[in-house]
Amino acid sequence: MNNTNRIDMQPIYIDLHIHTSENANNLNTNYDIAELVGQIKKLNGDSPFMISLTDHNTINKSAYLKAKNLGLNLIIGVELHIQNRAEAKSYHCHIYFNAPIEDDVIDSLNEILDELYPNKLPDRNDPNTPDIQKIINSFDTFDFILLPHGSQKHGAFNYSINDGENLDNAINRSIYYNQFDGFTARNRRGLEETIDYFKRLGINEFINLVTCTDNYNPIKYPESKSSEASEFLPTWMLAEPTFEGLRLSLSESSRLKYSSTKPEYWAEYLKSVNLENENI
C-alpha cells in the first residue's frame, strides 16, 4: 500500500550578497545585524529568509557570530576577485561554503583568504589576482559552490576578457560547466549580454540566476552602494534554508522564483510504501 504525505512549506527569501564593510581591509566589527534583520522582514513580509555576508576576499567573523547568535539561516560566503586571463580585468565571484558558523572554521577560511589576497581590495588589473584553478586548489578541503556575477558591468564574468580577445570556447565552456552552479545579479533585466556570452560558448539553456542586493548599509537595505544599480527583484527558494537547499535549487530551476511579493506556499510530497505480507 502506498501512502503519500504532504508537507507544506514556506518559500524562503534569499539574499546571498550582503556586505558588512565599505573597506574589506578594515572590517566593521559593529555591523548592525539586528537592523539588517528588521529591514529584511519589512521587505519580505516577515517571511523566512536565508542570507550570506559576502565581503570582498575576507569573512567578517564578528558579524557572522552575531548573526548565528540570533538564530539566522546563514551560509558562509565571500565575494572573490578572480582572474580569467592575464592582463585582463578580474571578475567577481561568490563562493559559499558548506561549513558550520564557528570560530575555528572561519579562522581557517580567513587564513587561506589572507594568503590569496593580502590586499582585500586589489585593483582589477592586478596580475597577482588568483585564477579559478588556484581558488579551487586552495579550498579543496571544503565543500563549496561558486556563483559569478552576471549582468553587472562591474566584475561580471563575461566582461573579464580583453576587448576583441579570441577565446577558446571549449576551455571557457568547461570552466562554466565544471565550476559554476549559476550566477548572480540584482534582477533579471540586463542579462542579455551575459546570456549571449554563454550562447557563444555553446551553453544555450538558461543558466540559474540568484538575485542579490549587494547592500552595504543595513539602514538602506535593499539598496546597493551604486546609485546606478538596477531595481532589486528578490529570489525565493522552494527548499530548506540551508546550503544543501541552495545546491538543490540550483540544480532544479523550478525551485527558484523571482518576485517582489512572496509566492504561494509550496509542498513536498513524501511517498512511503508499506509492504503487507505475512511472509515479509
Walk through the language-model features, giving the residues of each.
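Hydrophobic, aromatic-enriched interface-forming segments
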Residues: 123-166, 181
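Extended, solvent-exposed polar beta/coil surface segments
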Residues: 1-16, 52, 128-141
